[in-house]
C-alpha cells in the first residue's frame, strides 16, 4: 500500500519509486490497472527529439489512459513517443492490441529500464474524453533508457480522480 497525503506527496512518492507507474497506481488505488489507447500512430522524428534518433526516423506516438479495471475510473493520461526499433520484436504489436500498460510489457519482455526526469510538460495535453486541462494534480515528463540507450519519452498527467486515495496527513 502507498500512503500519499496530497498532490505534493504524490509527486514525491512518484519521484521516489523505482517500480513502474502501473505498480505504483495499483498499490495506491487497490485495483488492477489497464491502458486504454486513444491514439497509436507512427510519426517522423524531428531534430532535437531527446531520443537520439535521426530526423525522419519513424517513431510510435501513443496516447492512453490508465484506468482501474474494476471501477473504470481514469487515473493517468499519458502521451508517449517510442523508438520501437530499440525494443524487442512484438513490443509495438502487444502495445497496440492489448490493454497491458507499457511498464508491464517491458517487465514481461525482461527489458530493464531506467527513468530520467526531463521536467514538466511543455504544454497541455491534447483534448480527449478522459481529461480536461484542469483535471490533473501532477504532471511530469521523463525518458526511459535501456542499457543507456533512450527508448521512449513519456509525459503523464495524474488525474484528480486519485484524490479519494490520499490518506490524512
Residue ranges and their predicted role:
Residues 1-141, 145-169:
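N-terminal domain-onset segments
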